[in-house]
Amino acid sequence: MDQARAAPENIAKPIVWSIAGNDSGGGAGLSADARAAAAFGLHLCPVVAAVTAQNSVGVTRVEPVSPDLRYAQLAALGADMPPTAIKTGLLGSADNIAVVARWVDRLRARAPLALVVDPVLGASTGAAFADDAVLRAYRELLLPRATLVTPNAREARRLVDVCASED
């Protein structure tokens, strides 16, 4: 591991940044990513992209964090805890997708980096989180940089611009 990728000495596990939504119901987003990372022995650094108001039956509100706040979170981690991988979830806005894309490029200039894009475009209950600008940002900025993309069938159709009535 080169100096640009070296984690703080007190962290012996591989570092993964999860840039996703905070699910107040605890079933998805950063909560689920934290459980998955722990199961695989990874050190997860959660970066809050959006805050949701939701429970087990639905989502009542989604509030993306500002691009400045997202950038501040990434800059703090980038200065001290560089990742070997980034996993995205609910990003909430085209501006925030652009911030993530810039950080991926910046980190890859220093060392290899895997990017797993889970393009959360809506809730499992059907509520949509993504407008045309978000879809365009995914297509132009994140998907070309992705190592792996993990959409569900509905998200895949929206990302490739197939008629959503085929659900």
Regions found by a protein language model. Name each.
Residues K87-I97:
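N-terminal glycine-rich "phosphate-gripper" loop used for MgATP/nucleotide binding
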Residues A128-D167:
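Conserved phosphate/ATP/ADP-binding segment of small-molecule kinases
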